């Protein structure tokens, strides 16, 4: 008796060639609905599944493969006499090869399918057949990915059957595939049918391998890059690389951080970043001037940095950027001349990202791994209204200082805590990131500012991501000549800090919102 294969696919890629090959090898093919129509058109002999079950497809195809004559043929163990006896008693012939892929749930969702359309794209029979076949992989070969047709065909042609090793690998792949498929459905339905004030008791996330990496944060660490099952358009995961080597683990982390900073600015802006901290941010009326500001902010740290521009890279801007070593440049687009200039640098990575979708990226939850678990939170993307800020001091900030405070407050949100930043209204001047005490971060930011041209320091302000716990911070700020501060407020010693500002003639604004970043 010839061996039997069951083929039921939504993705018809490569199926005709595969079916022809196994038919030539003597396999009998059972098929369903649309798959049968394709095979019939190519004149490949096949049997309709209802001829096997004796039961017609019904309910618009919702019920067609959920039948004992199918699942018994998949699940029956060939090494157990009791199973083989049951199969004989019920006239069940074994099925040794299952080729199934699932209804395009993800594709329909990304295309904006209605709720009714999404429900119809929840595959029931397909996952059931895949799981049954995968469970019985000791005897059954199961294929859920057209990319695996060739390796199955190769073994069948050579040996008449597949190896246990291949069947085991394909079975594991099936359970990854169906788990991912169900995770997307669970995610969709959880969002569609929320329970008020209730957290889902299970968190189901699915990611697809985007890139295997040479190593992780350090050479002794292995790493891979996975993309969310529902892609975020404005993201490093969805970027398009035009030139250069593959991204490293650290490249991806830094590029992601830089994209998050750039997302907050609508005017022409350039962000320069190193080790997850901004080292230069500049805004201007045009992108070339914005580059000048970002570069001048810290011409030392920018070396080997990650650059994000929120406008097309022009020839003039490219000429300037090409004069220093940069790891990555990300922009919406590049002029022809700019691309030619930058592509001459062998080691630079040039990428594009769709900036028109940046607001949509704000909806994605942030997931952080810890030993034994995950932390999940919304992004820190609350829209703030500076008109609601409170002037806490006797001295009122000038209009120019208020504009600088708005800029500083956007920028300091992305500095690692304890985070301090000194800016004017269009440019960062000094960054003090990641110290375990706030006065340490203040000193670093002020030291970086001290070597700037006096003209750049005019109307400079200082921003702090969280409140000042002690007035000693104000003493340091006053020594540097800073005359305006923006911070959340909220310390039990706020009054001491306010009095220190009044003593030094410093204007200070409370925003009421903290922006820790760890």
From Swiss-Prot:
SMART domains: AICARFT_IMPCHas, MGS
Top-level taxonomic group: Bacteria
Any Gene Ontology CC annotation: cytosol
Coiled-coil spans in chain: none
The protein's Enzyme Commission number: 2.1.2.3, 3.5.4.10
Keyword hit for Transferase: yes
Keyword terms of this UniProt record: Hydrolase, Multifunctional enzyme, Purine biosynthesis, Transferase
Catalysed reactions listed for this entry: (6R)-10-formyltetrahydrofolate + 5-amino-1-(5-phospho-beta-D-ribosyl)imidazole-4-carboxamide = 5-formamido-1-(5-phospho-D-ribosyl)imidazole-4-carboxamide + (6S)-5,6,7,8-tetrahydrofolate; IMP + H2O = 5-formamido-1-(5-phospho-D-ribosyl)imidazole-4-carboxamide
Pathway: Purine metabolism; IMP biosynthesis via de novo pathway; 5-formamido-1-(5-phospho-D-ribosyl)imidazole-4-carboxamide from 5-amino-1-(5-phospho-D-ribosyl)imidazole-4-carboxamide (10-formyl THF route): step 1/1; Purine metabolism; IMP biosynthesis via de novo pathway; IMP from 5-formamido-1-(5-phospho-D-ribosyl)imidazole-4-carboxamide: step 1/1
MF terms in GO: IMP cyclohydrolase activity; phosphoribosylaminoimidazolecarboxamide formyltransferase activity
Record domain MGS-like: where: 1-144
Family annotation (InterPro entries): AICAR_Tfase_dup_dom_sf (IPR024051), Cytidine_deaminase-like (IPR016193), MGS-like_dom (IPR011607), MGS-like_dom_sf (IPR036914), PurH-like (IPR002695)
GO biological process terms, semicolon-separated: 'de novo' IMP biosynthetic process
Keyword presence, Zinc: no
Notes on the domains: The IMP cyclohydrolase activity resides in the N-terminal region.
Family stated for the protein in its record: Belongs to the PurH family.
PANTHER family: BIFUNCTIONAL PURINE BIOSYNTHESIS PROTEIN ATIC, BIFUNCTIONAL PURINE BIOSYNTHESIS PROTEIN PURH
Name by which UniProt lists this protein: Bifunctional purine biosynthesis protein PurH
Species assigned in the record: Lactococcus lactis subsp. cremoris (strain MG1363)
């Amino acid at each position: 008796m010839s061996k039997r294969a069951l083929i039921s696919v939504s993705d018809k890629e490569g199926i005709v060639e595969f079916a022809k090959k196994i038919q030539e090898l003597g396999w009998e093919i059972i098929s369903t609905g649309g798959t049968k129509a394709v095979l019939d058109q190519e004149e490949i002999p096949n049997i309709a599944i209802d001829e096997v079950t004796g039961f017609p497809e019904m309910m618009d195809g919702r019920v067609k493969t959920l039948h004992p004559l199918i699942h018994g043929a998949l699940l029956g163990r060939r090494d157990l006499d009791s199973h083989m006896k049951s199969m004989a008693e019920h006239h069940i012939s074994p099925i040794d090869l299952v080729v199934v892929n699932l209804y395009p749930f993800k594709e329909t969702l990304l295309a904006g399918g209605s709720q009714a359309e999404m429900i119809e794209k929840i595959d029931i029979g397909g996952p059931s057949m895949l799981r049954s076949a995968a469970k019985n992989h000791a005897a059954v070969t199961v294929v859920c990915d057209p990319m695996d047709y060739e390796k199955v065909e190769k073994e069948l042609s050579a040996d008449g059957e597949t190896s246990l090793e291949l069947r085991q690998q394909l079975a594991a792949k099936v359970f990854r595939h169906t788990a991912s498929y169900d995770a997307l459905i669970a995610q969709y339905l959880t969002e569609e049918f929320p329970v008020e004030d209730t957290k889902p008791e299970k968190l189901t996330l699915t990611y697809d391998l985007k890139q295997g990496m040479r190593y992780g944060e350090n050479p002794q660490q292995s790493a891979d890059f996975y993309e969310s099952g529902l892609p975020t358009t404005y993201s490093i995961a969805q970027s398009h690389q035009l030139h250069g080597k593959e991204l490293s683990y650290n490249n991806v982390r830094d590029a992601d951080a830089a994209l998050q900073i750039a997302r907050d600015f609508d005017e022409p802006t350039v962000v320069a970043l190193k080790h997850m901290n901004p080292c230069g941010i500049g805004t201007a009326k045009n992108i070339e001037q914005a580059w000048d500001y970002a570069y001048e902010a810290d011409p030392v740290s920018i070396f080997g940095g990650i650059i994000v521009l929120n406008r097309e890279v022009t020839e003039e801007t490219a000429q300037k950027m090409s004069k220093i070593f940069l790891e990555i440049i990300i922009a919406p687009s590049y002029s022809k001349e700019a691309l030619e200039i930058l592509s001459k640098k062998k080691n630079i990575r040039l990428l594009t990202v769709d900036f028109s979708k940046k607001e949509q990226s704000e909806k994605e939850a942030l997931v952080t791994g810890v030993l034994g678990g995950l932390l999940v939170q919304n992004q820190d993307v609350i829209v703030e209204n500076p008109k609601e800020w409170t002037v806490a001091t006797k001295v009122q900030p000038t209009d120019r200082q208020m504009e600088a405070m708005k800029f500083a407050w956007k920028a300091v949100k992305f500095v690692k805590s304890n985070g301090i930043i000194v800016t004017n209204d269009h440019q960062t001047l000094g960054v003090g990131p990641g110290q375990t005490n706030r006065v340490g971060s203040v000193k670093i930011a002020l030291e970086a500012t001290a070597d700037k041209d006096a003209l750049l320091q005019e109307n400079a302000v200082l921003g702090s991501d969280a409140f000042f716990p002690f007035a000693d911070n104000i003493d340091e700020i006053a020594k540097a000549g800073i005359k305006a501060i923006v911070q959340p407020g909220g310390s039990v010693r706020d009054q001491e800090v306010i009095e220190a500002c009044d003593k030094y003639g410093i204007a200070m604004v409370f925003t009421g919102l903290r922006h820790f970043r760890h």
